[in-house]
Amino acid sequence: MKIAVGCDHIVTYEKIAVVDYLKSQGHEIIDCGTYDNVRTHYPIFGKKVGEAVASGEAELGVVICGTGVGITNAVNKVPGIRAALVRDMTSAIYSKEELNANVIGFGGKIIGGLLMNDIIDAFLAAEYKPTEENKKWIEKMDSLQHASQDQNNPHFFDEFLEKWDRGEYHD
């Protein structure tokens, strides 16, 4: 599988370890940087990973910064990206199976490298399981990427809120 990987300067060594691990598993890597510990800004590298995935150059992406919050938010701004900040296998699998996530984000200073590798493996092995419900959710999320008239509609999520009120969701 072809995977784009990017990070900021705080977690360069963690990214290098992830890249080495993925290569050892037979994956082709697009290393979007950064490549050293010189101060930089995570949005640059989130954008690069997002563009590689959205364009089809890469099948999936992995982004890493200190907490994971900044770079995951940045990559989510790229149209066509559905990124999830994860810290466990359950969240990673859910993000792929239910939300068709195509990028996962990590806090490289939050979780250890071995756990990160296990979570990446779980994410890569998971497959999207389309249902009518999650297709609708994904469609709604994707429509938020463009300024649309629907987005400004105060009833944008009514369909789902009504189901909640009827007790149709069993979390």
From Swiss-Prot:
<dbReference type="InterPro" id="IPR036569">
    <property type="entry name" value="RpiB_LacA_LacB_sf"/>
</dbReference>
<dbReference type="GO" id="GO:0004751">
    <property type="term" value="F:ribose-5-phosphate isomerase activity"/>
</dbReference>
<keyword id="KW-0423">Lactose metabolism</keyword>
<dbReference type="GO" id="GO:0019512">
    <property type="term" value="P:lactose catabolic process via tagatose-6-phosphate"/>
</dbReference>
<dbReference type="GO" id="GO:0009052">
    <property type="term" value="P:pentose-phosphate shunt, non-oxidative branch"/>
</dbReference>
<keyword id="KW-0413">Isomerase</keyword>
<dbReference type="GO" id="GO:0019316">
    <property type="term" value="P:D-allose catabolic process"/>
</dbReference>
<dbReference type="InterPro" id="IPR004784">
    <property type="entry name" value="LacB"/>
</dbReference>
<dbReference type="GO" id="GO:0019388">
    <property type="term" value="P:galactose catabolic process"/>
</dbReference>
<comment type="similarity">
    <text>Belongs to the LacAB/RpiB family.</text>
</comment>
<dbReference type="InterPro" id="IPR003500">
    <property type="entry name" value="RpiB_LacA_LacB"/>
</dbReference>
<dbReference type="Pfam" id="PF02502">
    <property type="entry name" value="LacAB_rpiB"/>
</dbReference>
<protein>
    <recommendedName>
        <fullName>Galactose-6-phosphate isomerase subunit LacB 2</fullName>
        <ecNumber>5.3.1.26</ecNumber>
    </recommendedName>
</protein>
<comment type="pathway">
    <text>Carbohydrate metabolism; D-galactose 6-phosphate degradation; D-tagatose 6-phosphate from D-galactose 6-phosphate: step 1/1.</text>
</comment>
<comment type="subunit">
    <text>Heteromultimeric protein consisting of LacA and LacB.</text>
</comment>
<dbReference type="GO" id="GO:0050044">
    <property type="term" value="F:galactose-6-phosphate isomerase activity"/>
</dbReference>
